[in-house]
């Protein structure tokens, strides 16, 4: 094992299609699709994870290459469960999505405190999504 190796633990990421690059399903696109089709989405109030704007992740990759060897959580933190997160994303998008509560448990929450010690800090999940909307000219719906 190389003690100088840097391992970045990434969160679920999203972006909107652009620059002729393929975008696979991600949270905002899943919400827009569900709003269009009326398909219910299922999320749990016992599921905790960050969801990161891929452009913010990319912007922080170069500084991350200067980190000392170790394992780092690399993405947005989140102070809400996924049901609340999805509800907030839908409100920011200005869409109504049929959401159903599931009850399974998962905790993939990440703390960025270790990164902060080295001057790298991510926006919260909700702040980053608002930035994404601003970057694409959607602003506040």
Which residues does each predicted region cover?
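Mid/C-terminal beta-alpha module of Rossmann-like enzyme folds, strongest
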Residues: 58-106, 111-112, 141
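Amphipathic terminal alpha-helices
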Residues: 125-141
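NAD(P)-dependent short-chain dehydrogenase/reductase
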Residues: 1-49, 56
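Residue-level signal for the nucleotide or nucleotide-sugar donor/cofactor binding architecture
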Residues: 49-52, 80, 110, 120-123
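Structural element of the ATP-grasp superfamily
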Residues: 31, 114-115
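Hydrophobic/aromatic beta-strand patches that form the interior of the parallel beta-sheet core
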Residues: 6-8, 72, 123
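Residues at secondary-structure transition points
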Residues: 22, 26, 52, 105-106, ...
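Residues within well-ordered alpha-helical secondary structure of globular protein domains
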Residues: 63, 91, 121, 134-135
């Amino acid at each position: 094992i190389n003690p100088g190796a840097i391992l970045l633990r990434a969160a679920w990421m999203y972006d909107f299609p652009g620059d002729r690059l393929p975008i696979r399903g991600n949270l905002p696109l899943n919400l827009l699709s569900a709003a269009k089709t009326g398909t219910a989405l299922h999320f749990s109030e016992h599921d905790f994870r960050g969801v990161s704007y891929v452009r913010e992740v990319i912007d922080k990759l170069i500084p991350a290459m200067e980190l000392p060897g170790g394992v780092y959580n690399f993405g947005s933190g989140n102070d809400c469960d996924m049901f609340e997160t999805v509800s907030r994303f839908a409100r920011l998008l200005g869409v109504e999505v049929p959401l159903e509560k599931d009850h399974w448990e998962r905790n993939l929450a990440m703390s960025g405190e270790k990164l902060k010690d080295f001057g790298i800090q991510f926006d919260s999940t909700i702040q980053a999504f608002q930035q994404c909307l601003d970057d694409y000219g959607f602003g506040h719906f």
